[in-house]
Amino acid sequence: MKLKELVSGLDTIEVKGNMECDICGVQIDSRRVDNGCLFIAVRGTAADGHNYIGKAIEKGAVAVLCEDMPESMDERVAYVKVSN
């Protein structure tokens, strides 16, 4: 499925990158990310997924859904900022 289809119902604030990229899975745990995944950076009580965006990309994430855009962005990755 295309990233733009997956996020079409969300209230997106900002988008960077290719929204036409193919997504083969969705993960909130950076340790479980595989090639072609969308990584959702969840802010939890014990950990903040935003701290693991880099690790998720290293493991093959092609897109990131986040509340805050990272300071450093990989131009091969699509980033979608949402309010929550």
Predicted feature residues:
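N-terminal leader/targeting and accessory segments in enzymes
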Residues: 1-84
